[in-house]
Structures are given as C-alpha cells and as structure tokens.
From Swiss-Prot:
Pathway: Protein modification; lipoprotein biosynthesis (signal peptide cleavage). The chain crosses the membrane at residues 9-29, 69-89, 100-120, 133-153. Belongs to the peptidase A8 family. Coiled coil: none annotated. Keywords: Aspartyl protease, Cell inner membrane, Cell membrane, Hydrolase, Membrane, Protease, Transmembrane, Transmembrane helix. It is found in: Cell inner membrane. This is Lipoprotein signal peptidase. The active site is at D124, D142. GO terms for molecular function: aspartic-type endopeptidase activity.
Length: 165
C-alpha cells in the first residue's frame, strides 16, 4: 500500500472515529432519560443558542425520503464505494484539495451509514439557532459531508491554474 493510500485510509478512519465516538458519548450520556428527546446541554449567547439534544433520523438530510430508507442506504453505499475507488484506484495524481474534499465526503457518508447498520437510524445531536429559528439537528458526519461538498464545489468552479514548465 502506498503512503498516499495509507494516509488516506488513516484520515478517513480518524474522521469516522470522531463521528462515532461523539454519537456514542451522546447516547451513553442520554442513557435511559424519560424524555424522548432530552436536551443534554444548552448554551446561549444573547439570541444565539447551541444545544446537544439527540434525535433520530431515518431519511436523508432534514429527514427527507424517510419512506425510502433502504433505497437511500443502497445509494449511500454506492457513493462510498465510488469515492473509495476514485481515491485508491486512480493512477493519475489528484490535487490535495480535491482529495481532502473526497475524504471528508466519504468519512461523513461512512459515519452515517454505520449508524443505519448499528442503530437503524442516523443519530443527530447538534442544534444551533437564533431567537426562535433553529437549524435542523445534525452531527459530525453531516459537518464532514457539508465541508467536503463546499470544498469540492469551490475547487470545480475555481480551479488552480497549472504552472507551465
């Protein structure tokens, strides 16, 4: 295994581990609390707020397509395999930025697919908001997917110029 492949595998494993450990910590802390969706931690800065409150999502982003759970799982697995094939089998060198964005995407997808296999749903627990508005609850895998997508799209629309030798 090449150094690049080894570092890619270790980086993916590291991000997946961050996601799974935080979810496990939230579940263990939640324990057998009587409330279905307890607030485990809450902090406010004026009208801005942050809270840790575990929720369970059986669909895609924002709970969309929850009726098609197994179809979504299949699509997610195909995407993961496609990204892994690109990262490990591509002979032509990929830019570090593109590679990192794909590592983030793959790590987040693996994190959420692991939830589906272990718990039969995705565990979301981070909630942020302003005043009475709140963003849908998310997790670290979602952060990795969002960052990976932003970096990938940025790289597509603003490619670096090749130096002429």
């Amino acid at each position: 295994m090449s150094n690049r492949s080894r570092s890619t595998l270790l980086t993916i494993s590291f991000f997946v581990l961050i996601d799974w450990v935080t979810k496990l910590a939230v579940l263990l802390y939640r324990g057998n609390l009587p409330n279905a969706n307890p607030i485990l931690y809450q902090y406010s800065w004026g009208k801005l707020f942050f809270c840790i409150c575990p929720t369970f999502n059986e669909g895609a982003a924002f709970g969309l397509f929850s009726k098609y759970k197994y179809f979504l799982l299949l699509i997610r697995i195909v995407i993961i395999l496609g990204i892994l094939a690109f990262l490990f089998l591509r002979k032509k060198k990929t830019s570090a930025t593109t590679r990192f964005s794909l590592i983030l995407l793959c790590s987040g997808a693996i994190g959420n697919v692991g939830d589906i296999f272990f718990y039969n749903h995705v565990i979301d627990f981070i909630s942020i908001g302003y005043n009475r508005w709140s963003f849908p609850t998310f997790n670290f895998a979602d952060i990795f997917i969002s960052l990976g997508t932003l970096i990938f799209v940025y790289k597509l629309y603003f490619p670096t110029k090749q130096k002429i030798k």
